[in-house]
Amino acid sequence: MTSQSSRFFVPFKGKHYETGINGKKVLVVGASFYCDKYDCPCFSDCTSRDKKDSSPYNSTCPEYAKHGAELRNEPTYAIEENYPAYQRFSQMICDVVEERANNIWDFVAFTNYVQFFVPTKNTYKDYLSDRDFEAFIETLIELKPDVVISWGMVTIDDVRTNNKYVIDKEKLPDSEWYICHLKVPGIDHSITLFCCFHPSSKDWYEDFDKCAEYLRQVIDYEK
């Protein structure tokens, strides 16, 4: 972790992020990264839900070190691996902006909300901390996105419901609770916050068409 930073994970930034999607800079925020190396001697400490700090193992994790990799760069590694959830999200973008579908990650930035490796596939409320929200705001100030797409319901209280920077919660029903806006100190423009189900959930498919419709509005794209 860098000095005076709440953030552990370094966001992935696509090479055309500044160009964006239809001229809008888009930051995608997932829930958490998990570790399944249960036999690793570092596992219990690295994924401790009490400590919530994987940084001591950033460059010494046995699994990552043998590949010359660092834990903090997991957002980039996850994009390179193109896990099923990421493929499903790309499918959504395909439905919205067809010409960008094959290389959508080149045009967006990505990170996860929780700032340590969790010990389970699912993200639970007790994994979250104030540090994660501080890291989220830190990332917004750094990347200055026009749009934030937040995956999942576990983080929604932090990202939206209890977020003091949301300026128009009263208008959420107008978009069936998909769209609101943030005004963060240090950023001149307001940020559109788009909250949807996590691509790994069954609700993702059940809500797919409606989600695509509102996402199309957010990026001002017309088929």
Q: Over which residues does each language-model region extend?
A:
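Active-site and ligand/interface coordination hotspots across diverse enzymes
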Residues: 1-81, 132-135, 139, 178-186, ...
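Beta-strand-turn-beta hairpins that frame and shape the catalytic cleft
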Residues: 21-26, 97, 101-107, 181-194
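Structural recognition of the beta-strand scaffold that forms the well-ordered cores
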Residues: 27-28, 110, 147-150, 195
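Short, solvent-exposed loop/turn segments at secondary-structure junctions
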Residues: 31-36, 114-118, 153-157, 198-202
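Surface-exposed cleft-lining segments at the edges of enzyme active sites
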Residues: 65-84, 113-129, 198
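Signature of the catalytic double-stranded beta-helix
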Residues: 76-99
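C-terminal capping/extension of enzyme domains
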Residues: 123-137, 156-223
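Proline-aspartate-enriched helix->loop->beta-strand connector
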Residues: 136-153
